[in-house]
Amino acid sequence: QANADITLFNGGIPGLLEKSHQDMAWRDLVDYSITAVPIITSGRTSRKLQRSEYESIAKKLKSLRIDVLIMAGGDGSLQFLNTLSEFEINCFGVGMTIDNDVYGSDYTIGFSTACEKIIKEVY
């Protein structure tokens, strides 16, 4: 790792599997915060990961000296983080789903936007 403050994995869980990452400094985030340019892509997988895949991801994160993996998503993403944490990886999940169905949370990012869109369509 090139002394980066942040390492981004494009494509969500598939990006972690493909080991597709980019290093970024905090200063870069300031630049992106004033533009509408996306700096990372999302992704999903519809299949259950094998233990060997979790081991591979954990090994990659440890080799990059990642202190914590932060992931935003729904139930599947949070279940993924829960399992990955069993491989001694510090994980932090941010509930982000229009369903607002993340256990233990009263609110998720995306829910209010979905409600607003529905109200606009109805009225």
Annotate each PLM feature.
Residues F9-N10, T41, M71-G73, F92-G93, ...:
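Short beta-strand segments
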Residues K19-S20, N82, G104:
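Short, well-ordered secondary-structure micro-motifs
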Residues L16-M71, G76-S77, I109-Y123:
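Glycine-rich oxoanion-binding loops at beta->alpha junctions
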Residues A2-T7, S85-T108, K117-I119:
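Short, acidic/small-residue loops that bind anionic groups at enzyme active sites
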Residues Q1-L17:
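N-terminal phosphate-binding or glycine-rich loops at protein starts, especially the Walker A/P-loop
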Residues Q1, M24, I57, L84-F87:
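Short, solvent-exposed amphipathic alpha-helical segments in soluble enzyme
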Residues I13-L16, L78, T97-V102:
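Short gly/pro/ser/thr-enriched loop/turn and capping motifs at secondary-structure boundaries
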Residues G11, M24-R27, T35, G93, ...:
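Residue-level signal for pocket-adjacent positions within structured domains
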